[in-house]
Amino acid sequence: MRNTVSTFQELKNKGEKITMLTAYDYSMAKLIDSSGINGILVGDSLGMVCLGYENTLSVTMEDMLHHTKAVVRGTSNALVVGDMPFMSYQTSIYDAVYNAGRFIKEAGAHAVKLEGGATVAEEIKAIVKAQIPVMGHIGLTPQSVNMFGGFKVQGKNEKVAKKLIEDAKILEEAGAFSIVLECIPEKLSKIISESISIPTIGIGAGKYCDGQILVYQDMLSMFSDFKPKFVKSFGNIGESIKDGVSQYIKEVKEAKFPEEKHAFKIDDDVINKLY
């Protein structure tokens, strides 16, 4: 049975942790979905881990719709959330609703995510009014990397911490069904999670959130450009891939692959007539 926004709320209400990962293509989405994950975020992080950009700012709506369609086709259980890219909702409330609608209508997503606190409350209200579930995102919001001066922990002083608590409450009031808390101190995420009734999903926000999300390339050691402090490696798939490719190259060079069992047959009578 497909997870829904109601599933997320039910899990929080009974104290069971929510599990999420990113995915960007059909084959990986299918693997993750079959593992029993509650939700998959088609994150604009694809700009960095799939497209090689320095940050997420260059990702377009067309990029996001293309990848979201593939992920949806690979799932039957997970709630699929489409990440609204930079400048797809900041320009106007009309654009926010229109682009959120494209994720649902064209890509088949079940919800959208957008970054920001009080500044995006009206956009969230309008999107929810259009019957589209919204996941909020506060703390380190990568689309604001130039304002933050880099990828830095947020909420370490009283002023910013209080604002994050207030932002979470505002997002709940605006109609968000859950909120991602990224790169904020663990004890602050505990206060936020206890201050609102909707689920919090942490990434670099400690153990007190109602759920967790990671970029799958990070948690499987597939992305070597950098490794955030908050990431734990749950498998060294990157090395396994390199080992497999190296072995393939070796066997091709040495004419050990393909073997007879990998080849298709033809009758000798037919072959003899070809000479």
UniProtKB/Swiss-Prot annotation:
Catalytic function, reaction form: 3-methyl-2-oxobutanoate + (6R)-5,10-methylene-5,6,7,8-tetrahydrofolate + H2O = 2-dehydropantoate + (6S)-5,6,7,8-tetrahydrofolate
Pathway where this protein functions: Cofactor biosynthesis; (R)-pantothenate biosynthesis; (R)-pantoate from 3-methyl-2-oxobutanoate: step 1/2
SUPFAM superfamilies cross-referenced by the UniProt entry: Phosphoenolpyruvate/pyruvate domain
GO cellular component, one term: cytoplasm
Record NCBIfam families: panB, PRK00311.1
Function: Catalyzes the reversible reaction in which hydroxymethyl group from 5,10-methylenetetrahydrofolate is transferred onto alpha-ketoisovalerate to form ketopantoate.
Subunit structure: Homodecamer; pentamer of dimers.
Protein name: 3-methyl-2-oxobutanoate hydroxymethyltransferase
Source species: Clostridium botulinum (strain Langeland / NCTC 10281 / Type F)
